[in-house]
Amino acid sequence: MFKMVSSPHTHSSNLTAKFMLWVMVAMLPALGMQAYFFGYGVFIQVFIALLLAVAIEIAIAKLRRKLTAFYVADLSGVLTALILAMSIPPYAPYWIIVIGIIVALLLAKHSYGGLGQNLFNPAMVAYALLLVSFPVQMTGWLVPIDLLNEPPTFGDAISLVFSGVTSDGFSVHQLLGSVDGIAQATPLDSAKTSMQKLGVEGVLQSPIFSGLFANGWWQINLAFLAGGLLLIYKSIIHWQIPAAMLGMFALLSGLTDLLLPHTHLNVVSQLFSGAMMFGAFFIATDPVTASITPRGKLIFGGLIGLFVYLIRYYGNYPDAVAFSVLLANICVPLIDHYTQPRLYGSGR
């Protein structure tokens, strides 16, 4: 005898926690690269973020009289914390990540009803708010430690995060100023501030674009690319969004190089600088805030690529992934409405 039950009659073993865990595993190579090139501050920021995220998820569960495991075990808050911690400068003051996690989880996630209800990517809401509110702290990226005369020790890293200075009394900006030829800490920052004075050739000859230094951001982006390809292979994310985002940006950047040569960094340098690969594979592909239709995913990814291009090339911010993702999130309901697959046998 067969037992009569309602649908669904088949079940998938893919739970939310499993998906989140795979995403975090895919981020580990990039996390290791960030720590290798920027030091212990990366791990300190991640530790603070994860600890606070778990505490907030437990508190929300108790306030809503839910089982603690209901909010913590799905790992969504933990993943949000990891993404935000890897997005901010490793030696930013501790209160930056504290404010960011509170904004991401309380304002951008749980105020909408929790997982699956939020309209905007929580980590990017927090990042954008931090960048606008605290621009000095959010642009305090150190150069890779190989270029520093005295790389921060573990004790220095703790001191920088919690007091703002090393044990010898040096701030992040003082450490950055000890490196000749560096105006800002990241390649995009340096190119944005130095392009008019030095030109493309002069920028590319600076320490930030030559030798091991240049390989720092390239290798971090390559690590994100490798992790993203793993997620596509495991069917954790779909290929349409990253392909459309990177393709649109590369197309527009390439056309700019042809029409206005020697005015901006080349396409490859743009693709492997900043948060491009991070955004394409780990941020834009958020299943809650991204488009859900096949054609919609292509449009959504293409929009992000377009916004990144416009802001990077013509805006005031050297990197633009956070703002681009949030702008595209606004368009998702409209995109999904007009890209619903046609039912078999129905008219267009």
From Swiss-Prot:
Pfam families in the record, alphabetically? NQR2_RnfD_RnfE (PF03116)
- Residue positions, PTM FMN phosphoryl threonine: T186
Record's subcellular location: Cell inner membrane
Keywords, ordered alphabetically? Cell inner membrane, Cell membrane, Electron transport, Flavoprotein, FMN, Membrane, Phosphoprotein, Translocase, Transmembrane, Transmembrane helix, Transport
Instruction: Tell me what topology the record assigns in the membrane.
Output: Multi-pass membrane protein
One BP term from GO: transmembrane transport
- Needed cofactors: FMN
What stretches pass through the bilayer? Answer: 15-35, 36-56, 67-87, 88-108, 125-145, 212-232, 241-261, 265-285, 298-318, 320-340
InterPro entries of this UniProt entry? NqrB/RnfD, RnfD_bac
- Single GO cellular component term: plasma membrane
EC numbers for this chain: 7.-.-.-
- Family, per entry: Belongs to the NqrB/RnfD family.
Q: How does it assemble?
A: The complex is composed of six subunits: RnfA, RnfB, RnfC, RnfD, RnfE and RnfG.
Q: What does this protein do?
A: Part of a membrane-bound complex that couples electron transfer with translocation of ions across the membrane.
NCBIfam families in UniProt: PRK00816.1 (NF002011), rnfD (TIGR01946)
What protein am I looking at? Answer: Ion-translocating oxidoreductase complex subunit D
Q: Which organism is it from?
A: Actinobacillus pleuropneumoniae serotype 7 (strain AP76)
